[in-house]
Amino acid sequence: MNEGLNVVAFKEMKVPESLAMMHYDVHKDKPFFPWLVDFISSAPVLTMIFEADNAIQKIRDALGATFVQKADPDALRGKYGIWAGINIAHASDAPETAAKEIELWTNEGGLTESSDAEEEARAYITKYAVGDVDYTMEIRNTVKDAIENHDTSDSVPQKLTELLSKDAEGIPSEQIEALAKVIFDFVIEEVEKS
């Protein structure tokens, strides 16, 4: 779509827990594994396959650092990530990983290559990129303030749900609430660690 990247597969989907577990299998023994599974399966995600010379590095450069606070403000994670690993996107880190993930998402997630994929991706962006209103910073600050102030009250998930609802027209309320809950679970973990 830019940087010489071609979208060869595009699909919006609700990720089943079983697929989320397979995707993050490399982290299965880590304490954050259950949270990762909940996060990726809480609301719809976009799955894509890009094709280009040096595609992996180009995508990783466009996304920025994994942790939002370390990402360049002009990178996608810097602009739209929420906090720490709530970073809006996953990207393969090596050709071997990409091959494994492409196989997983095509076989288990129904992602298919299509000559219409680029057009579908552009239509999706056009549909959701209306207006100049963006609640990312409000969501980010809600999470940051809750962690810094050790606030695990009911007002935090309520505020997250309210902000996510404004930013997610057409997405069912139960999916918005599920995403708000997963983000709040992260807040609770961070508060308990400090």
Regions flagged by a language model, labelled:
Residues M1-S194:
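Non-catalytic terminal and connector segments of soluble metabolic enzymes
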